[in-house]
Amino acid sequence: DSSLQVDFFDVHPYILINYQGTESDLYTLVHELGHAVQSYMLSDKYEYWEFGVPEFLVEIPSTLNEILLSEYFINSVSEESEYMNSTFKYLDKIKTNVFKQAQITLFELKLYDNEIDTNNIGTIYKEINDLFYGETVNSDQLISYEWCRLSSLYMNFYAYQYITSFGAAMYIFNSLNSKKEALFIGKYDDPIEYMREYDVDFESKSMYNILFDKMNQLLLTVK
């Protein structure tokens, strides 16, 4: 990975990043800053034994920062070409955090449902990739090995949490002024019940519909 955020109780967080000043690097930086700021706030609020973020919620502040940066880009450009570029990158963020992570999660499920060996892991991955991209995309056989570089696979069923977190982040973005406290959760709180206090319901279709409505809105502007 090109970046890493590490937090310690009662000490400021550390971010390790190979920052070269590109727009992609900026997105990576704001993502890691989301983790870092949440860690810093929690260090002030909780005792040592309570310090930490439930894994289920850890990607909310990081992806919220990506949304904020994407919104800044599309609302601050003046040239149509710049707007189109920023909009496509925004759409790519949605694709990466939602559809790609759904693809990875389905891949994990299939691995548990099958006897696997070095020959069929890649085959399973390519079949799922072809399912998601459809007949209009001809995937190179090398896509069978893409799974090897996915660090989230080293943490059991981590990828789906990008989907839930991005959905929650989009919901929080749409009501940001009233949801600020939602990022102060400690590791011993029940994450789903805690977030319901701020009207963020992971079991409600309406939360995810806001995300898909945003995607459709962006698609309409670039048609």
Spans of features found by a protein language model:
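Catalytic Zn2+-binding segment of zinc metalloproteases
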Residues: G34-Y48
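C-terminal, non-catalytic "cap/extension" segments appended to globular domains
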Residues: L29, V37, N75-V77, V98-Q101, ...
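Internal glycine-rich alpha/beta core junctions
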Residues: Y27-V37, F56-L57, P61, L68, ...
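Short, glycine-/Ser/Thr-/acidic-enriched flexible segments
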Residues: Q20-S24, G34-H35, L69-S70, G167, ...
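Post-HExxH zinc-binding segment in Zn-dependent metallohydrolases
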Residues: L42, G52-E82, K89-D92, T96, ...
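Contiguous, non-catalytic segments that form substrate-binding/exosite surfaces or channel walls
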Residues: D1-Y14, F212, L219
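Short beta-alpha connecting loops at secondary-structure transitions
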Residues: Y14-N18, Y46-E55, S86-D92, Y112, ...
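Short pre-active-site segment immediately N-terminal to the catalytic Zn-binding motif
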Residues: F8-V30
